[in-house]
Amino acid sequence: MQFIIKGDLIHMKFVIQRVSNASCTVEGNITGSIQKGFLVLIGISDQDTIQIADKMIKKLLGMRIFEDSDGKTNLSLHDVNGELLLISQFTLYADCRKGNRPSFTNAGKPDMAKQMYEYIIDQCKKEIPVVEQGIFGADMKISLLNDGPFTIILDSAEIC
């Protein structure tokens, strides 16, 4: 079986969407809601480490994808007092090469992935005043208003 890998590592993935607003609802209750900022879908593998997470967080928080007064994407989340909505999404590891039913064997095991997801949330809260989240493992309904749209996929293989 082949994976999208560098060496023998499966990569941590962030899908970053610049939004005007976004929210997460679980069983009819809003678990997180933000205004201008990033909705981040987070894919965690069993091979991810704290060091990888730290590099991904640094890159995420430093991304300059908001427009300055000249209309150039030159401002970071910090610069615009942006907010974060962080959602764990194991389906980022879907392997669709065989048959019609995706395999998710590359996704992190729930216990480890939940700890890593919580670590990412905690680290982001140290830097960004408003950090909201979904509920790990829950069936979530995500609403968002894309700004742009502006969507970036960060793969730890490209930055680590």
Positions of PLM-derived features:
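Short, Lys/Arg-enriched N-terminal segments with co-localized hydrophobic residues
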Residues: 2-11
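Long, amphipathic alpha-helical "stalk/connector" segments that mediate intersubunit docking
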Residues: 12-40
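Short beta-strand segments
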Residues: 17, 43, 88, 143, ...
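Short glycine-enriched loops at secondary-structure junctions
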Residues: 20, 84, 89-92
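Compact, glycine-rich, soluble single-domain proteins
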Residues: 30-81, 94-122, 127
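Residue-level signal for inorganic ion chemistry
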Residues: 56, 87, 150
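Glycine/charge-rich, flexible interdomain linkers and switch-proximal surface loops
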Residues: 69-84, 132-144
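Positively charged, low-complexity, intrinsically disordered RNA-binding extensions
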Residues: 104-160
